[in-house]
Amino acid sequence: MSKTRIYEVAKELGMNSKELMEFLEKELNISVKSHMSTIEEETVQVIMDLIEEERQTKKEVKKQKEPSKEKGKSSEQVKVKEKSKEEPVEEKFLREVTITSHDLSLDILAKQIGLEQNDIIKDMFMKGVVLRPGQKLDITMAENIAMNYNVILNFEIEKKETEEGKEQDIEAILAKKWNDIYEKEKDKLAPRPPVVTIMGHVDHGKTTLLDKIRNTHVADKEEGGITQSIGAYQIEYNGQKITFIDTPGHEAFTEMRARGAQVTDIVVLIIAADDGVMPQTIEAYNHAKSANVPIIVAINKIDKPNANVELTKQQMVSKLNLIPEDWGGDTITVLVSAKTGEGIDELLEMILLVSEMQEIRCIPDGKARAVIIESRVDKAMGPLGTVIVKDGILKVGDDFISGSTYGRVRRLINDKGESLIKAVPSTPVQVLGFNDVPNTHSILYVIDSKEEARTLAEKVKEKEEEKSKGPAKRHVKLEDIMQKMEEEEKKKLNILLKASTYGEIEALRNAIQKFENPEIDIEIIHAGIGPVSTSDIMLASASDAIVLGFRVKADSKALKMAEAEGIEVRRYNIIFDLIDDIKKALEGMLEPIQKEELTGNGVIKEEFKIKGVGKIAGVQVNEGYVQRDGGVRIYRNGGLIADVKIKSLKHYKDEVKSIEAPKECGIQFENFEDFTKGDELEFYKHVFVKRELGLEQKTK
């Protein structure tokens, strides 16, 4: 008989799994473990009939509650009786409640009208409406729910939004202000230097190429041969400036790369002539493509003996759909050698040419707007933010806001370590003067005064805190009420993450999220910058988490506490090692896969009937072996007649675990005796294989 999963039945009934499970236990005394449990088709039909009957009964009861005339009683007596029996009808629309927010959820509505959220859920369920704790409500739904409790909702939202909306959406207003300036003063816009990002596969020569342009040597000093954080540099070529953003090379740093592309005007996609188009090449191309950024391809390592430029171009066409100009396409392709410097000048010329074609413009003066591409805390200088100025002039002494942080520019430092008085558009500078570490990817806006900046930043922070608190509270309710059974089934890995910069945090978070799996919940309970501290260990202990540090130290007190508490602390300098360890940990948590393995074959030579035991097959093992806890497929004239388990395996009179070819044995099959001499046997066993998890396994 066929079976159906709980969640499928719930979906058909317009319920959620938790509600159906409660109904089964209460009404039918059927206990199921989870939403993935199965029930017989017969039971499904019974459930559907019961719920439909219950819903129908509720409708009839509602109809019967209509006021009716009663004979032999005075009108006054009738009214008194009706009032006592049908009080909700008599008091309908007697109470009004004012709502002042669009952000209305079921728990908030329940509080506003003076009821328990669970009572509303039960009442509405009996009316055929399924609600969930903390569920978001639109105006119509909220009004319908309230009407069931004789409540009218008065929505006074427009006025509130007019008065408070501006304060709540500070960043949107600042962004709109700049967009309006662009629209109104197009004739005043001026050219600015292009911001270029070099992208590509790991070890294809990005850092070496950038170093050749800047005449520096960074790559040899870096651990693991890859860039460890985002940097921005500016060079001058033929009297024109070009700003470069150097992004990490490993594919795990997709978030860093995406952030780099967002502030980028031009992407240089680097491909090694001796390696061709690789996975990270495709990934980098997709980021540039989604950002709608023009792409210049630099085919690097042309100095190597095994360089194959033509094959690389073929792969550009087949894997990226980029057709080089010399092949009749429109993709500018430059042959370079980051090692010898060949082709570098041509690459810079092409960058300036594309920049001219793109007509990259900015507001050349006035208050500045800049993009934060990196942030960190320096022991001596405090919170720092690396920015690229997009518009206006950023000056020492300027007051600014950046998300929920604010400050006054105390110092500007360029990529050469020089202090500047001001920074013009496309200039990368490090800004000192933040009150706290700013979020990477946020926008810095210069404001009239520090007081105004502080006020605006505090309002942004309040809004962020409200957002973080709201969903968190509802999440706890959902877990407590609806998802407990899922948590009992799923395994969970809690991680506390520490790194040296926010850029690394974002990139590592992105890499870890790629390992999400239906069987395992991965939760980063905390992510911060700086050394691993005692407070981190305390949090990890309370949350049963592992502590992962990337390019950070750990306090000696923290390490002692971790040892005492039994908390695992691992620190890494190379991203590959960290990701590999997480992958191994998750693979160890996955249930192994059961696979079938053929062990041998044989033929039935004789049949024996033993009183009180049953029919036994006398078997000749031809190849391999047969084992007692294995299975057997029985074939007759080439066709499969049975697939059975082995009940007993004997060699002469002895019960044995296995028999190898070319020995003979006696086999009793489990619940099967319809065999005969000449039947062919195929022996197999089930083995458990450890599962592997790849970066590509993304389920959400």
UniProtKB/Swiss-Prot annotation:
InterPro entries: EF-G-like_DII, IF2_II, IF2_N, P-loop_NTPase, Small_GTP-bd, T_Tr_GTP-bd_dom, TF_IF2_bacterial-like, TIF_IF2. The keyword GTP-binding applies. It is found in: Cytoplasm. One of its GO terms (cellular component) is cytosol. Residues 300-303 are annotated as: G4. One of the essential components for the initiation of protein synthesis. Protects formylmethionyl-tRNA from spontaneous hydrolysis and promotes its binding to the 30S ribosomal subunits. Also involved in the hydrolysis of GTP during the formation of the 70S ribosomal complex. Disulfide bonds: none annotated. It comes from the Bacteria. Residues 225-229 are annotated as: G2. Its main location: cytoplasm. Residues 200-207 are annotated as: G1. Belongs to the TRAFAC class translation factor GTPase superfamily. Classic translation factor GTPase family. IF-2 subfamily. The keyword Ribosomal protein does not apply. GO terms for molecular function: GTP binding; GTPase activity; translation initiation factor activity. The gene is infB. This is Translation initiation factor IF-2.
